[in-house]
């Protein structure tokens, strides 16, 4: 365990929550001058932190605790009937690892995804600068997992490879390929990849009970939720 007590953290001013607009959110950030050390990152992930661009953060809201860190314990996971169908439906997909970079192919896919799936969110409208700042960081543990069929790019899972697991940073995919359930397939693939690498978990970020867009996370069972500084398993 790293000496986390020596790290400095800063809190933002309260602002409107992007998930629950009726709530005021505060975010706790690791000191940006702190080098992005992979072991520090792993230890903070176990405490509910996430990465966005060059920053490690977690919610630190005074009057709300709706954002619950979630992870999938890889060795315990068993796909259900629907998930097995998704795996079978995508058996033709080839996955390869790439270094994070800006390419027109990546951005075009990202742009279609944001415009068709998240036009009501704070990432709309998408821009090249936003894409690069958010996802294209020169970090040794960051990967762009490309999902392709006959060289056609269908999805990119931006994933951090940590000593204790895979952290699913962000996934964007072809919005017209609804039948494939590419977002769910990407998570299933990451679970299998974490198992292959003999890692402990896949970190999914935050689950919010009253946010429809987050409901998919609890469809992967068992799932572990960080509650009162302790990971609790739900079967």
From Swiss-Prot:
InterPro entries: Acyl_CoA_acyltransferase (IPR016181), Asp_Glu_LeuTrfase (IPR017138), N-end_Aminoacyl_Trfase (IPR030700), N-end_Aminoacyl_Trfase_C (IPR007472), N-end_Aminoacyl_Trfase_N (IPR007471). It catalyses: N-terminal L-glutamyl-[protein] + L-leucyl-tRNA(Leu) = N-terminal L-leucyl-L-glutamyl-[protein] + tRNA(Leu) + H(+); N-terminal L-aspartyl-[protein] + L-leucyl-tRNA(Leu) = N-terminal L-leucyl-L-aspartyl-[protein] + tRNA(Leu) + H(+). Its EC number is 2.3.2.29. Its main location: cytoplasm. One of its GO terms (molecular function) is leucyl-tRNA--protein transferase activity. Keywords: Acyltransferase, Cytoplasm, Transferase. One of its GO terms (biological process) is ubiquitin-dependent protein catabolic process via the N-end rule pathway. One of its GO terms (cellular component) is cytoplasm. It is found in: Cytoplasm. Functions in the N-end rule pathway of protein degradation where it conjugates Leu from its aminoacyl-tRNA to the N-termini of proteins containing an N-terminal aspartate or glutamate. Belongs to the R-transferase family. Bpt subfamily. This is Aspartate/glutamate leucyltransferase. It comes from Pseudomonas syringae pv. syringae (strain B728a).
């Amino acid at each position: 365990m790293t000496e986390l007590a020596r790290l400095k953290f800063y809190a933002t001013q309260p602002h409107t929550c992007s998930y629950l607009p009726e709530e005021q959110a505060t975010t706790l950030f690791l000191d940006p001058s702190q080098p992005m050390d992979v072991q520090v990152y792993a230890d903070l992930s176990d405490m509910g932190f996430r990465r966005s661009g060059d920053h490690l953060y977690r919610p630190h809201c005074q009057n709300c605790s709706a954002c619950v860190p979630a992870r999938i314990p890889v060795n315990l996971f068993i796909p259900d009937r629907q998930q097995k169908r998704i795996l079978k439906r995508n058996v033709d997909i080839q996955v390869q690892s790439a270094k994070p970079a800006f390419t027109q192919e990546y951005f075009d896919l990202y742009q279609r995804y944001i415009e068709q799936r998240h036009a009501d969110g704070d990432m709309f409208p998408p821009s090249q600068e936003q894409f690069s700042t958010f996802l294209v960081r020169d970090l040794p543990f960051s990967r762009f997992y490309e999902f392709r069929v006959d060289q056609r790019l269908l999805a990119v899972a931006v994933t951090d490879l940590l000593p204790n697991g895979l952290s699913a940073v962000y996934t964007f995919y072809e919005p017209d390929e609804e039948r494939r359930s590419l977002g769910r397939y990407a998570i299933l693939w990451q679970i299998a990849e974490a198992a292959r690498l003999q890692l402990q978990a896949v970190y999914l970020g935050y689950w919010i009970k009253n946010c429809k867009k987050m409901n998919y996370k609890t469809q992967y069972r068992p799932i572990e939720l960080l509650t009162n500084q302790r990971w609790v398993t739900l079967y």
